[in-house]
Amino acid sequence: MSTNSGTEYLCRENHPWAAGVAAGCVACLLALSGCATHGTSRTGRGLPKSAYPVTPQTNVVETLHGVRVADPYRWLEDENAPATKAWVEAENKVTFAYLAGIPEREAIQRRLTQLWNYERYGVPVKQGGRYFFSKNDGLQNQSVLYVAESLDAAPRVLLDPNTLSKDGTVALSGTAISDDGQRLAYGVAVAGSDWQEWRVRDVATAQDLPDVIKWVKFSGASWTKDGQGFFYSRYDEPTEAQRLTKVNYFQKLYFHKLGTAQAEDVLVYERPDQKEWGFSGGVTDDGRYLVITVSQGTDPKNRVFYKDLQAPGAKVVELLNDFDASYNFIDNDGPVFWFQTDLDAPRGRVIAIDTRAPARRNWKELIPQAAETIQGVSAVNQQFFVNYLKDAHTQVKVFDLGGRFVREIPLPSLGSAGGFSGKRSDTETFYSFTSFNTPGVIFRYDATAATSTVFRQPKVAFNPDDYETRQVFYASKDGTRIPMFISHKKGLKLDGRTPTLLYGYGGFNISLTPSFSVANLVWMEMGGVYAMPNLRGGGEYGEEWHQAGTKARKQNVFDDFVAAAEWLIANGYTTRARLAISGGSNGGLLVGACMTQRPDLFGACLPAVGVMDMLRFHKFTIGWAWTSDYGSPDNAEDFKALLAYSPLQNLRPGTRYPATLITTADHDDRVVPAHSFKFAARLQACQRGANPVLIRIETRAGHGAGKPTTKLIEEAADKLGFLVKTLRMSVKPPE
């Protein structure tokens, strides 16, 4: 189906600690030695309370469901207020002075830069006989979009986002290529904002057309078969003062005809009676239908409507009109639609629905639920390519259109594979493979010969064979079996005091799978252990696993993470003082909750762009959409559960909390920075002892998507330097 992306307002991060930076690099000298000795840092690591800016407290108290709740730092929610801007400047001054004073930081940043400097390719997409792909030469702030007339032809630059801003903070946020390969619709985002502006470029000339589409958020674009226009979703224009904080309701689906002004765009579908509904429109490959996926917040359950584009005056048909399961459209054979669904199958199955006889009794199951969890399905070469997760690593199986198993596609090792896009008539497809020690390799799959060949493989400045990964299973507090990946250098002596970084997420049906990260590699080079458990709330084992970590069951996620930490200590990897935890967005909430519940268990904490005020998250931008996972503070029962773990409300004065580096960004309009601002102010006030409490506030940056390479490297260097100092590691300087 010709579409870019759907409603992507998941509470999710993209930053140096999130495994998933496809990598490789040119040859360079080893800058840091794997030498995690247990000596004392060359400088003191503590900060007295007098080092922090004075943060005024105001007398703001609300009574919520009979409970009086104080919110003395609410004034920090106004990011445009002069007082807030002054506070940000003062906090950053303290933070960056502390980080700059870490002797090892310069060498760490140098090594990060060396390892980041390699060619990285995206998975190619074929449209109209042309091949489109992204490529980053190494240290470019943004990847460049290329086009080639054939696989053997020299590619040419189609769109270079690096030319759109001097500091690299204007990023490509989405692309959609017309069926004939003649036009490119593309979205750009400024300073990491979720707001996008869409434009159109002629592929032959690489020149923009006059078309400009504004106020797009959580939407891709999907071209009509004739390439004369595309469908997209948008919100009403906010005022400038409310652009980063206004709640986003009433998304609408439009059609834009090339060569016309946005004011002339045709409203295709809206629901004034359903303010929380979001719409993603995709045109089927045969061009006949517009398939409308209807979502409500981040709940994976959705409805599906469609419109016959070949029938003049056709109305929107409500095909699946209940939020009873997830239905992901795969492709169609005329009036027969194929879906991946978890209806009566929490790990997923594939069904066929004939739109001429859509009653549920007429549905046909093509691929039944398996022991593994379906992550995605595509239709290429008259076959289904099904991406499964088996204990959080990828398996890819091929079935014919009748659902009969054909073969499994061999993968290099335990890791993650993604891609396999294309049309049903295509005889080739492309996919990427990555693992903790393998930067992204692009493969071309010949569907006729059933063979994979390496299409692009990065040249790396380290030996992947120097590292090893194992998967263990441990028992959580309630006995649930939880998987965890553990990676480190081969031959690493585990003496029970090895610096260890524990990373987690656990929410929104999102699966964490093995993936390469430059920051994680440098951590392991320095002798650290990297551990990543697959917590409940994620999607690794299907919808039941997801639901086990939501709403009143959210505490399960924190228990799973704490149990992972205790397992690492009990099994001789590390000590409490040398164990750090990290997570972003929903993972930032995870870190905040665990450090408030078990401040004794960790040596350092790195919460990034976290949801810290669980009593007010629903009042900003798209926060209301997360109630499917968190519950609503407006509901008395949900409020009780939220108050029990909300990081901001559970900080206690006079408690010795771990050394903490909070990270956020001034343009984050998904998890607004007020969450981190208020948490930092409260934590600094509550902290007993000299463990530092710092907040690093990135300027001209958002939730993480599109962050330029320079900022990614600087942030990773700051975090690694902070861990080296607070965990008392000794790192050998570069030779």
Q: What does each model-identified segment do?
A:
Residues N162-S178, Y186-S193, A204-P210, R404, ...:
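Cap/lid segment of the alpha/beta-hydrolase catalytic domain
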Residues A519, M526, M532-E735:
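Active-site-proximal cap/loop segments of hydrolase catalytic domains
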Residues G129, D180-Q182, D226-Q228, R288, ...:
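Short coil/turn segments that connect the beta-strands within blades of beta-propeller domains
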Residues V147-A148, R199-V203, V247-G259, V304-L309, ...:
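Beta-propeller blade signature
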Residues P82-A176, G187, W277-D308, G313-N332, ...:
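Non-catalytic accessory segments flanking enzyme active sites
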Residues A36-H38:
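Bacterial signal peptide processing site
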Residues L32-G34:
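C-terminal motif of bacterial Sec signal peptides marking the signal peptidase cleavage site
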Residues N136-S143, S165-V170, V188-E197, V212-K217, ...:
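A flexible loop/linker signature enriched in serine peptidases of the S9 family
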